[in-house]
């Protein structure tokens, strides 16, 4: 039976510790030739609005643990300026909405096991990757984090960093003062 798993359900069961451990295991499998992956590919097409492009993105991978997955994203991409700083923004349908979907299959019989909304999962995955980097590459006594941005990805990274290091000080670089200050309060 194919499962349909939404963001709320993922938030209820997936911890950052579990995500870091799963990704570490995946990287070990990849190094041992027991897993495969294709890096993300994004394809852009101009829309009727010259300031926006449609972007379709996919990435996929699997392992001898028995699973193969493909992640698909559908976005509208544009540039936005705030106080002289230009950033790339994206959304699906309207700002604030995102459309990412993972199809999980069995490598043993090809069965479709699950449709998974990737909104929360992708933040956890990217944050955990940062945490793994800090775990193995940062000085063992590092206590200060400098982070660019104050959005969802910054939150996921900080959650991962605090799982692998004792963080005493956070320096946030974000163009929007209100967002930067709120992020600092929430992370304290």
Describe the predicted segments one by one:
Residues 161:
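Aromatic pocket-lining residues of Rossmann-like dinucleotide-binding sites
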Residues 147:
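Active-site cradle of extracellular carbohydrate-active enzymes
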Residues 137-144, 166:
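Short helix-loop-beta connector
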